[in-house]
Amino acid sequence: MKIKIHNKTNISIKYLTKILKKIFFFVPERQNIHIIFITPLKMKKMNFYYRQKDYDTDVLSFINEIDKDSLGDIFINLKKAQKQSQNYNHSLSREVCFLATHGYLHLKGYEHHSKDELKKMLIIQEKMLKKVDLDKKIISKNKKNNND
């Protein structure tokens, strides 16, 4: 799968671009996706406009119904991802890839309205992350990954 990355923040994402391309390299899709890094304010506005939720969130995804070559767009709140990576005591790379895979699964039709649905999504996400050594087991054993 090809991904196109857009950075609408003032935070450098060069190292994130490499790992995101690597994780989606293993996905056997012909369509591409866009991953867009945005600010908390932009995310809050989008969350309110599209979901009527008046707060910023970490990730939103939207299916692209116009361009048949594109599966959709994944918007990631980079500041929130930074905070969450610190709260969960893992690398920013893991958090961003976790959010990107989560958004991708939503584009593929997965939902998490129940605990079972969420568990199924989390298992798939961890399998995807494991392919680039960002799964939970690797991170907890290898503390040097926390230096992103």
From Swiss-Prot:
Cofactor(s) recorded in Swiss-Prot or TrEMBL: Zn(2+)
Keyword Cytoplasm recorded: yes
TM stretches of this protein: none
Cysteines paired by S-S bonds: none
Name of the top EC class for this enzyme: hydrolase
Keywords: Cytoplasm, Endonuclease, Hydrolase, Metal-binding, Nuclease, Ribosome biogenesis, rRNA processing, Zinc
Bound cofactor: record note: Binds 1 zinc ion.
Alphabetical GO biological process terms: rRNA processing
Chief site of localization: cytoplasm
Any one Gene Ontology molecular-function term assigned to this protein's record: RNA endonuclease activity
Entry binding sites for Zn(2+): 102, 106, 112
The keyword Chaperone is annotated on this UniProt entry: no
GO CC list: cytoplasm
Subcellular location: Cytoplasm
EC number: 3.1.-.-
Matching PANTHER family: ENDORIBONUCLEASE YBEY, CHLOROPLASTIC
Job of this protein: Single strand-specific metallo-endoribonuclease involved in late-stage 70S ribosome quality control and in maturation of the 3' terminus of the 16S rRNA.
Recorded family membership: Belongs to the endoribonuclease YbeY family.
Protein name: Endoribonuclease YbeY
Organism: Phytoplasma mali (strain AT)
Primary gene name: ybeY
